[in-house]
């Protein structure tokens, strides 16, 4: 009986997620959260050895490629056209203020000169540290750098792949060693936070690999991820570094913003976004086509209109928008992406002040659009007015409006405040196909 009790107790301890104990965000961390919310728009970059196969970042798992075969990519990944300056400028010209870069994805390949593994970019024919170049350029151009870091691993044998849901076909036979894997992650995170200057945040992904099913809404996993130790390590090395975990659940103590994948907060079309919305800063990420990593056959490109409206809808729900690109294996961001980003950038040049530095959830999102607010004005974003009424009705509106004008042109707009809400009259106004913005002062 005693042996059974000890076994059950051990199982409970291993499967329980422990948050960072007694976590109180530092003053610098709280300030970083506010600045993060102000930025509103960032670039996600999925890129690495998997890009060579041009079938997306999950190709190792999806095609059941064994480690002894997949490791040959290190001989051919040679991104000779990679230009960190161009990548950062592309993001900046699109109106983005931060970049989240894949330092290590689920295939375990490190895009930096880690001392913890030989499976890294500096052992390819390219032989250079991509993260170092990107970090230096971000710091030079005033763009914040976040590091995506995979919790799961399809390549290493010390990762507890026996209980994981993915990576079953990669040919691993050796018994896993969880303590070794946790030590490996801590060592790599220490490298990221000590060798590359200011890191604005760490973006974790892969917790869900150790859950029984995708509908599991608890933090109980088959392994102990040691989040208490990992989060404490990060906040000790860089106190203002923000932590997010794409576990599709409510954040736990130690996490500084809540991530949503391919869905706006409160909307769950993909099955990833069922978590309740926390009081922390929010971020939603989305792709420019279907794939995250480079996929040569994926031509399902989203339009400029779709992406601008996604950005506006995110801001109206008080969330940042992290828009992904998957560069080619040679290091070039494909023209379809750069052309679209340039067009988004032109829109941002005119309208960024209605997005950047604002907050949302002033009133719930409406069928016709959303509202954002800064310290002096509210911005009514009319994205999709379907009815023929000559007015726009904003329910639950309590602020006192002095004037209303079209944001572009400052033409006065008629309005009337009633107990039930605000009426804005649209007679004589030609609605823009993407976003008609009315500024309320």
Task: Report residues per predicted region.
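Mature catalytic domains of secreted/periplasmic carbohydrate-active enzymes
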Residues: 20-441
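Bacterial Sec-dependent N-terminal signal peptides
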Residues: 1-21
């Amino acid at each position: 009986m005693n042996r059974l009790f000890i076994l059950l107790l051990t199982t409970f301890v291993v499967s329980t997620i422990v948050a960072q104990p007694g976590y109180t965000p530092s003053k610098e961390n709280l300030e970083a959260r506010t600045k993060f919310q102000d930025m509103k728009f960032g670039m996600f970059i999925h890129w690495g050895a998997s890009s060579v196969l041009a079938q997306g970042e999950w190709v190792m798992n999806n095609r059941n490629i064994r480690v002894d075969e997949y490791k040959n990519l290190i001989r051919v990944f040679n991104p000779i056209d990679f230009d960190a300056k161009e990548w950062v400028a592309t993001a900046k010209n699109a109106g983005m203020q931060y970049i989240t870069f894949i330092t290590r994805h689920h295939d375990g390949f490190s895009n930096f000169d880690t001392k913890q593994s030989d499976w890294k970019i500096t052992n390819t024919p390219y032989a250079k540290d991509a993260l170092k170049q990107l970090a230096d350029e971000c710091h030079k151009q005033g763009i914040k750098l976040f590091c995506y870091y995979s919790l799961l691993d399809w390549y290493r044998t010390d990762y507890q792949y026996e209980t994981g849901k993915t990576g079953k076909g990669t040919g691993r036979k050796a018994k896993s060693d969880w303590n070794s894997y946790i030590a490996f992650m801590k060592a790599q995170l220490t490298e990221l936070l000590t060798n590359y200057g200011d890191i604005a945040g760490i973006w974790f992904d892969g917790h869900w690999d150790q859950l029984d099913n995708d509908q599991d809404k608890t933090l109980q996993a088959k392994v102990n991820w040691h989040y208490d130790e990992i989060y404490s390590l990060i906040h000790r090395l860089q106190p203002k570094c923000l932590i997010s975990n794409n576990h599709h659940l409510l954040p736990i103590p130690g996490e500084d913003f809540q991530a949503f994948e391919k869905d706006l907060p409160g909307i769950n079309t993909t099955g990833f976004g069922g978590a309740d919305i926390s009081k922390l800063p929010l971020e939603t990420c989305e792709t420019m086509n279907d794939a995250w990593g480079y996929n040569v056959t994926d031509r399902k490109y989203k339009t400029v209109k779709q992406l601008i409206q996604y950005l506006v809808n995110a801001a109206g729900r008080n969330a940042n928008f992290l828009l992904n690109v998957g560069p080619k294996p040679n290091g070039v961001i494909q023209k379809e992406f750069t052309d679209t980003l340039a067009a988004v950038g032109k829109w941002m040049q005119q309208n960024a002040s209605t997005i950047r530095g604002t907050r949302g959830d002033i009133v719930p999102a409406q069928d016709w659009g959303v509202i954002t607010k800064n310290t002096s004005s509210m911005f009514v974003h009319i994205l999709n007015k379907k009815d023929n009424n000559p007015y726009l009705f904003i329910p639950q509106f309590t602020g006192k409006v002095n004037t209303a004008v079209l944001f572009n042109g400052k033409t006065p707009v008629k309005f009337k405040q009633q107990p039930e809400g605000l009426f804005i009259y649209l007679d004589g106004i030609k609605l823009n196909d993407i976003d008609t913005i009315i500024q309320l002062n």
